[in-house]
């Protein structure tokens, strides 16, 4: 907390929005700009985490509207929201709206002669490049890289996850 001038407070009120910018409807796009495999993968994870949730029974269009990833546009048809495009869209459509959009993950080492050991980025072209798929791709890479010491539980099954997996 800090003391603001009256002018600064007026500026803050002028800048506030009643609606979050990420639910702005992108009227110029249809839902075909969203990657169906990403939506399918997200729904599988959603159902695993929220079994019995009423949204699991919804069709994709309704599900996306509940997530606020899609909404009716000025013509009354469905379009993605900014959040929906970023989360489920294809990188080449995302960069039409956000030209500087670029997700980049690198595994670097101390050897200055080696730029990186592994790299993936949203403009590779062989995957969607959206935020959700990027998260899944990087998380899987990090998860697979965790060393798991060989240990058996009392019931005879191998321990295949360690605390680091949970932290990730």
Predicted features and spans:
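Active-site helix-to-loop segments that bind/position phosphate- or nucleotide-bearing substrates
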Residues: 1-168
């Amino acid at each position: 907390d800090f003391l603001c001038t009256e002018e600064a407070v007026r500026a803050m009120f002028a800048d506030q929005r009643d609606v979050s910018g990420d639910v702005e409807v992108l009227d110029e796009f249809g839902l075909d700009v969203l990657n169906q495999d990403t939506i399918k993968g997200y729904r599988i994870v959603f159902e695993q985490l929220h079994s019995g949730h009423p949204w699991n029974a919804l069709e994709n269009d309704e599900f996306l509207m509940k997530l606020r990833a899609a909404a009716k546009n000025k013509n009354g048809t469905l379009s993605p929201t900014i959040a929906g495009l970023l989360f489920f869209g294809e990188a080449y459509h995302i960069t039409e709206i956000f030209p500087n959009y670029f997700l980049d993950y690198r595994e670097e080492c101390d050897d200055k002669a080696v730029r990186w050991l592994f790299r993936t980025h949203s403009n590779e072209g062989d995957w969607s490049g959206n935020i959700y798929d990027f998260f899944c791709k990087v998380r899987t890479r990090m998860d697979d890289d965790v060393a798991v010491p060989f240990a058996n539980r009392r019931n005879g099954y191998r321990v295949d996850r360690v605390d680091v997996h949970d932290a990730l």
